[in-house]
């Protein structure tokens, strides 16, 4: 879908809300995949629904002068790492890795994102952020290495 929109576009972010421990969307969850087109200066989002259906959205780029209201960091097109890693683990592997560092009974993943939040261990690089319904959030590197809690 992304390459049909713009062959030069690059994926910049993956974000899941209300995800099962197996990595699949719950009945009220969804996965979002965002791409950036330098040529068009626009974002392209694919929202994958639990039933397998999807929605496609095109959005303008944020104002280059925009800044995060908490960190005061300039907002770029989207995503932490500007170069997507050549290889990266999928959400199922990232969730399993994070679960191995979590105590207590877990029921779901409230949020799972790749290249959306920055890890202090690997600044400027893509990492998974996994947040369960109980306990802390966890950073997992693109290579599957556990990076710590957040």
Q: What does each model-found stretch correspond to?
A:
Residues 1-150:
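Long, terminal "pre-/pro-" and other extracytoplasmic accessory regions
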């Amino acid at each position: 879908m992304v390459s049909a929109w713009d062959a030069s576009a690059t994926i910049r972010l993956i974000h899941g809300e209300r995800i099962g421990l197996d990595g699949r969307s719950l009945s009220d969850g969804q996965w979002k995949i965002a791409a950036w087109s330098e040529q068009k200066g626009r974002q392209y989002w694919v929202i994958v629904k639990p039933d397998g259906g999807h929605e496609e959205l095109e959005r303008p780029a944020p104002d280059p002068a925009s800044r995060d209201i908490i960190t005061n960091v300039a907002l770029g097109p989207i995503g932490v790492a500007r170069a997507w890693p050549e290889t990266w683990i999928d959400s199922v592997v990232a969730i399993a890795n994070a679960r191995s560092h979590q105590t207590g009974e877990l029921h779901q993943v409230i949020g799972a994102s790749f290249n959306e939040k920055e890890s202090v261990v690997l600044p400027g690089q893509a990492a998974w952020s996994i947040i369960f319904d109980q306990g802390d959030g966890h950073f997992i590197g693109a290579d599957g290495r556990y990076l710590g809690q957040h």
